[in-house]
């Protein structure tokens, strides 16, 4: 039950309100949420299944794509089922520990996806700029080390947030006008000084996501320089088509992420009935569209999907 605490004791249960001002429309709003989530789940699961079962796709590019699809499933599953529970059953009550667990996986998976996109940019750089050395540079041993590094970075940087939140006393309103928990959104309900939470969150953002964006930009500048110096137009076109799908996913992922961050920091005058749905769309859009983009833009995956869905049935 949502309450305002006057005793000074810390709340252990919070209430996720859903979309403030649109509670009477929650059932209708849940329909596109549910369809998008099922699409993301099926699309990414199919992508993972095809990549893992087809030996012709056991290449670094597709293995990194498999990692991205797995992260997409985790990110959407961390948020959308909770939102649907609120929309359908008004099940908005969430314990503090569960709230912290949810935001831990949301933030760490976001950083993990950013790291995977950086690795994919590095993969494209080697494939286009050093094609003859591609297999000797991106060995299976290096790929395993990259996977471990991406995981350690994402979970390692977010892990201290658990203790930064557990130290706080939540003696203010326990009603959260959102469909899921996030770090600063929860911390602002504390009676303590949360400047360390704010600065730590900012430092994580700068040292991971912003750094990844800079390195991705540099890698693609080098790629474009190499592409436009290729001897034949056909080779240039083929190279551009190779990483076109990756560029689309980068724009989709970072564009939606930047919008969400800017809205949280500077969009205080944006009504919650607009901000909350857009925040969910920004989390759900990349997982839903990534398999579609790669299915359309990548010929090898397109062929394997068609073979799996249609030829196998015959």
From Swiss-Prot:
It comes from the Eukaryota. The keyword Cell membrane applies. Glycans are attached at residue 5. Residues 49-56, 123-141, 220-239, 297-314 are cytoplasmic. Residues 1-27, 78-101, 163-198, 261-275 are extracellular. Odorant receptor. Belongs to the G-protein coupled receptor 1 family. This is Olfactory receptor 52B4. It comes from Homo sapiens. The gene is OR52B4.
């Amino acid at each position: 039950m949502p309450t305002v605490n006057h005793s000074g004791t810390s709340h252990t249960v919070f209430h996720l309100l859903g979309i403030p001002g649109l509670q009477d429309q929650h059932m209708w709003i849940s329909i596109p949420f549910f369809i998008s989530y099922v699409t993301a789940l099926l699309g990414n699961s199919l992508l993972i299944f095809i990549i893992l079962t087809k030996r012709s796709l056991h290449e670094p590019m597709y293995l990194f794509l498999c990692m991205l699809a797995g992260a997409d499933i985790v990110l959407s599953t961390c948020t959308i089922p909770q939102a649907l529970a609120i929309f359908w059953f008004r099940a908005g009550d969430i314990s503090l520990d569960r709230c912290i667990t949810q935001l831990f996986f949301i933030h760490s998976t976001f950083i993990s996806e950013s790291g995977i996109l950086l690795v994919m940019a590095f993969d494209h750089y080697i494939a286009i700029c050093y094609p003859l050395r591609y297999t000797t540079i991106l060995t299976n041993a290096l790929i395993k080390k990259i996977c471990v590094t991406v995981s350690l970075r994402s979970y390692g940087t977010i892990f201290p947030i658990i203790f930064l939140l557990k130290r706080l006393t939540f003696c203010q309103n326990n009603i959260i006008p959102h469909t899921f928990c996030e770090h600063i959104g929860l911390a602002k309900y504390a009676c303590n000084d949360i400047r360390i939470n704010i600065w730590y969150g900012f430092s994580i953002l700068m040292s991971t996501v912003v750094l990844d964006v800079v390195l991705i930009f540099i890698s693609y500048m080098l790629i474009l320089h190499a592409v436009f110096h290729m001897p034949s137009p056909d080779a240039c076109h083929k190279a551009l088509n190779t990483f076109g799908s990756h560029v689309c996913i980068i724009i989709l992922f970072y564009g939606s992420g930047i919008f969400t961050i800017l809205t949280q920091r500077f969009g205080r005058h944006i009504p919650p009935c607009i901000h909350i749905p857009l925040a969910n769309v920004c989390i759900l859009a990349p997982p839903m569209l990534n398999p579609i983009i790669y299915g359309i833009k990548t010929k090898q995956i397109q062929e394997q999907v068609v073979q799996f869905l249609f030829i196998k049935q015959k």
